């Protein structure tokens, strides 16, 4: 039994060395980029800004901000390394300055999945501050496959300031919303009016910006609706006027007419009861749905968006340090 355990440890050490990760006397595993390759990089678009450092044989460390969302930080693993629990976060001087004292920043939760460590905007800003000051960041926790084996992930500050400046420029060009936030939207109307109130314009302006920026948008489906008050024929005509008014708002601001599919339904598809004033207010609406098709060779992740399946039926929109 003792020989079997010793053999397992020797095999584990051989495998780790073959993978190119360091193993100390207690099989401490350290993942870090080689010094000559430990540069920070930026992927920039109007949809998302990504500041990241590739980590050899581990994955990557990422500062990400999608359009319309706060910034966050995460570690992405190629293969699972950390056990669930809490990792220690420490700051230390970089390799080329020699060994120095480590300063603890606290603990961070570790969860299962491709992103075992995730940090919100406030915590990610603290990490950025340490990297700008030329400090190394160290995440330390036990391995999921052996409790006695520590796993460490090291982030280097090399070329961070230059990349962060580029990242900030990207942030200034982000759209106000992302696809998930805008692809199903609803504009409401007052009483029997065929025109929406001015307070609905910001939503439509955000939608227009998105449609004009996304080359893979194929259709914007516009559906007009009314409440149950009045004659059905009158309501059908009113829903048509509302849908066309919204369509005109889009086309006069640059959305190509050929992208629009305009439909109207009168009172046929209520989303709430017409017996109350609140319900009727919800039913007086025009819904907009953005359909898009992106070739498989392209990735929504690179644009910072998540894929969504759409149907033809009219629908209402719905640190830690």
Residues of each region from the PLM?
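Periplasmic peptidoglycan-binding/tethering modules of Gram-negative envelope proteins
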Residues: 136-218, 292-321
């Amino acid at each position: 039994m003792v020989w079997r355990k010793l053999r397992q440890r020797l095999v584990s050490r051989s495998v780790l060395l073959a993978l190119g990760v360091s193993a100390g006397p207690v099989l401490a595993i350290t993942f870090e980029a080689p010094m000559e390759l430990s540069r920070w990089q930026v992927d920039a678009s109007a949809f998302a800004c990504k500041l990241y450092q590739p980590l050899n044989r581990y994955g990557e460390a990422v500062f990400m901000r999608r359009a319309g969302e706060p910034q966050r930080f995460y570690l992405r693993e190629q293969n699972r390394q950390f056990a669930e629990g809490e990792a220690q976060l420490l700051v230390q001087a970089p390799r080329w300055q020699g060994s120095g004292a480590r300063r603890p920043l606290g603990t961070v939760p570790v969860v299962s999945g491709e992103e075992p460590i995730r940090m919100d905007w406030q915590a990610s800003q603290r990490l950025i501050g340490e990297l700008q000051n030329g400090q190394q960041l160290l995440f330390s926790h036990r391995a999921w496959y052996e409790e006695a084996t520590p796993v460490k992930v090291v982030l280097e500050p090399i070329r961070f300031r230059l990349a962060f400046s580029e990242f900030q420029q990207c942030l200034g060009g982000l759209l106000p919303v992302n696809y998930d936030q805008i692809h199903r939207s609803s504009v409401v109307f007052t009483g029997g009016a065929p025109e929406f109130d001015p307070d609905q314009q910001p939503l439509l302006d955000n939608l227009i910006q998105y449609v004009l920026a996304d080359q893979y948008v194929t259709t914007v489906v516009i559906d007009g609706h009314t409440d149950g008050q009045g004659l059905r024929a009158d309501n059908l005509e009113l829903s048509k006027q509302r849908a066309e008014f919204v369509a005109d708002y889009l086309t006069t601001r640059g959305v190509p007419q050929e992208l629009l599919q305009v439909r109207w339904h009168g009172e046929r598809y209520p989303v709430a009861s017409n017996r109350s004033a609140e319900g009727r207010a919800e039913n007086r609406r025009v819904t907009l749905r953005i359909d898009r098709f992106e070739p498989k060779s392209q990735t929504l992740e690179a644009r910072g968006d998540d894929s969504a399946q759409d149907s033809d039926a009219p629908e209402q929109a719905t640190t830690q340090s």
